[in-house]
């Protein structure tokens, strides 16, 4: 692994850390200025059953009687050490509340991503091997059609068709296999349209290159050409698409959980908003920002390893820098 790549990785890591810190501070400020007093609406709500002594202990433990800047410092310090604080509503650790529902959301998001990849690559494959007179135009219209379709519309349609009309699953059992399956499809279809749009465009571009024309002149058919020549170079941008849309994927998962009535991070967010449980809401949003930044960081670090053209660019920049420092033209002894 070259020094240029290590420098690049260290720079991207530093940028990611700064973005995470700024995202946490921004989230804290936004949550702090939300209308309403959580002490009155949550702690002093008779339905929650807190005594005055318990209220005083919670206020002192969470530092709610401290200035905002002090609260921010303590909150950020605790977050960086893995302490997500306590829920004002249940007086339980926020990390415990998230851990109870996170697996369900992760399973749904992973299932949706799997559906999206399978569907996107299938559609892209069809655009390269299916003759135009046999429906290739419909396959090429797939991204445009579903990019503009909200996922909750797809979810409601699937619930109506397969839940009420065909009765394939019971709507009151949102965690059943079929409910999870259709929830994954709800997430996967719009996401697959984004991937397919990029993949089809790159496949068309690669198909026009000289190496593809040479392969066709040697008698290689569309299926083999797709598998052995076009797929790999055209698939590299998909890594970037997935990284850039991971936030949308998680957001769609939360919306889909609400539509299908599933227990997950979405239901926890909904409950936290309705009860003004600000510590829970703040940590969920902050963790979402961390996931988004980390996934994009991984994509940035992987891309130079997956695409030789990116490595050449990194190396070329380093060679130019060394040549400039030595006042020598490239190729006269400057070592990369």
List each model region and its residues.
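Short membrane-interfacial helix/loop motifs at transmembrane-helix boundaries
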Residues: 55-96
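Alpha-helical transmembrane segments of integral membrane proteins
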Residues: 3-6, 98-135, 151, 175-336
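Juxtamembrane/transmembrane-helix interface segments of polytopic membrane transporters
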Residues: 19, 23, 27-31, 155, ...
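Hydrophobic alpha-helical transmembrane segments of membrane transport/permease proteins
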Residues: 20-70, 167-182
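Generic hydrophobic transmembrane alpha-helix motif, especially the helices
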Residues: 139-193
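Transmembrane helix irregularities
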Residues: 34, 146-149, 250
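Charged, compositionally biased N-terminal leader segments and the immediate start
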Residues: 1-33, 228
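Membrane-interface helix starts
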Residues: 14-18, 68, 110
